[in-house]
């Protein structure tokens, strides 16, 4: 706006300024009334946003015996049905401080507290000389508006953490005596995909279960802590007699794996497996695992007969002499002892064993040739072999076949059931599908549907399959 000068210029300017001031005042008042916060919103505001910082006027203030140059007061409304998402600790000066903020929790969403902040008062009462359990109880039992006087810790920007892990064990924080706060723990089961939000604490990470209704994170033991715990239990059992987890003798004795045992000793200490989500892709190998007598070979034969253009079984190699009527490459490839020994030394066998003085084994090259024909290699192997197969080269779908759960339990069925439980408890983390073989045709249908689902929907796979 341009004002032209004339003799009444001072009066005109004064009138214009007054009009503008009135208009702005009315507009401000209207906006203020429209945006007036509700009582709940007002209670949720923190004094930090209003700049309510208390400074000493030259002489240091004291609270909890500490000299302060600055203190801040924050307030928020505590919802009784939702945890605050904060844990406390005593710092090196034995003062109450914020140990961690759980991602997605009430405090995290408000941003009113930060890790390392010292808490001097809660609702006007000093927290000096209180234990951590007493402090947590005070917060848990406080309802409505909560006010705190805090000494803020200088904040540094930390790089955000976002990774995904598959839980390889069942975890219930209520049963964990090591967790600093059971209420802050995250319960999960073997196979759950966990989004890791924060791993600054070397012992307790923050995560949340993927596709879970709860939006806030919880505490889980870090891989280091869980592996230490598992190793401690294993060490305690060292004095006990070591034997095969599958005590019953089998037709094929002295079974071996085509890798060094030390590798598997490392793999036996389980905690989490880092995973990545991939678009749908074709599985190259179907692996059937189960106790002897459970019916996995019957299921395998039905699949091979029903879909010869889709599945193929790798023909094993043997040192047994070729008999009359034996066609090389039909049921077996017949090779010499020297050739078999070379294959074993070169780690070319997936697994091998001896029977009646002859060696039998599956060479990995036969599996690769099936893949080259654009077919799915169908395997029924020992449970230990899954560790070798679980790579991008084999791209497997692992299926565990459990025995029938019918009421009529014969002695033989009870033995199969017991051995199946041992396999499942030991290798549960490797199975993509678990089915109960009450009916062969129904079991075949479940396998077909599982394979179709795995090849048509996005899948979580070990990160080693990609990088």
From Swiss-Prot:
Membrane topology listed for this record: Peripheral membrane protein
Family (UniProt): Belongs to the MAGUK family.
Pfam families linked to this entry: Guanylate_kin, PDZ, SH3_1
Native source organism of the sequence: Takifugu rubripes (Japanese pufferfish)
SUPFAM superfamilies according to UniProt: P-loop containing nucleoside triphosphate hydrolases (SSF52540), PDZ domain-like (SSF50156), SH3-domain (SSF50044)
PTM (free text): Extensively palmitoylated.
Stated name of the protein: 55 kDa erythrocyte membrane protein
Stretches assigned to the PDZ domain: 73-154
Domain SH3: 160-230
Annotated compartments: Membrane
Keywords: Lipoprotein, Membrane, Palmitate, SH3 domain
Gene: mpp1
Cross-referenced CDD domains: GMPK (cd00071), PDZ_MPP1-like (cd10830), SH3_MPP1 (cd12080)
The protein's role, per its UniProt record: May play a role in the regulation of neutrophil polarization.
Record domain Guanylate kinase-like: where: 283-452
Gene Ontology terms: cellular component: membrane
């Amino acid at each position: 706006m341009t004002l032209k000068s004339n003799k009444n210029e001072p009066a005109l300017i004064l009138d214009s300024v007054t009009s503008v001031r009135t208009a702005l005042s009315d507009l401000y008042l209207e906006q203020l009334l429209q945006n007036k916060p509700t009582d709940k919103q007002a209670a949720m505001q923190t004094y930090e946003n209003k700049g309510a910082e208390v400074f000493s006027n030259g002489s240091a203030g004291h609270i909890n015996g500490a000299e302060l140059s600055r203190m801040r007061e924050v307030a928020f409304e505590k919802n009784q049905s939702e945890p605050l998402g904060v844990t406390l600790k005593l710092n090196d000066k034995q003062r109450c401080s914020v140990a961690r903020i759980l991602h997605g929790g009430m405090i995290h969403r408000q941003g009113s507290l930060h890790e390392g902040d010292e808490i001097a008062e809660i609702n006007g009462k000093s927290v000096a000389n209180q234990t951590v359990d007493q402090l947590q109880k005070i917060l848990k039992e406080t309802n409505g508006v909560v006010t705190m006087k805090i000494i803020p810790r200088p904040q540094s920007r930390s790089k955000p953490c976002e990774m995904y892990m598959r839980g390889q064990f069942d975890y219930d924080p209520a049963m964990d005596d090591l967790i600093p706060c059971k209420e802050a723990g995250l319960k999960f089961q073997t196979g759950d995909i966990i989004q890791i939000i924060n791993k600054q604490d070397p012992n307790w990470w923050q995560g949340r279960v993927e596709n879970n209704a709860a939006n806030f994170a919880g505490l889980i033991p870090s891989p280091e802590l869980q592996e230490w715990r598992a190793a401690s239990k294993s060490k305690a059992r060292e004095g006990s007699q070591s034997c095969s987890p599958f005590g019953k003798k089998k037709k094929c004795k002295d079974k071996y794996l085509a890798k060094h045992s030390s590798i598997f000793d490392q793999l036996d200490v389980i905690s989490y497996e880092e995973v990545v989500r991939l678009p749908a892709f074709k599985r190259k190998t179907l692996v059937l695992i189960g106790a002897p007598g459970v019916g996995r070979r019957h299921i395998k034969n039905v699949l091979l007969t029903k879909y010869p253009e889709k599945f193929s079984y790798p023909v094993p190699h043997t040192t047994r002499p070729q008999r009359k009527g034996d066609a090389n490459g039909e049921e077996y490839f017949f090779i010499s002892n020297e050739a078999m020994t070379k294959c074993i030394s070169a780690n070319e066998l997936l697994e091998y064993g001896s029977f009646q003085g002859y060696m039998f084994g599956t060479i990995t090259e036969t599996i690769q040739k099936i893949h080259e024909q654009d077919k799915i290699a169908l395997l029924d192997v020992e449970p230990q072999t899954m560790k070798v197969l679980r790579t991008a080269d084999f791209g497997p779908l692992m299926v565990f076949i459990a025995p029938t759960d019918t009421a009529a339990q014969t002695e033989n069925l009870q033995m199969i059931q017991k051995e199946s439980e041992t396999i499942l408890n030991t290798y549960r983390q490797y199975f993509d599908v678990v089915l109960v073989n009450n009916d062969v045709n129904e079991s075949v249908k479940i396998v077909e549907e599982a394979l179709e689902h795995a090849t048509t929907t996005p899948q979580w796979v070990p990160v080693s399959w990609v990088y």
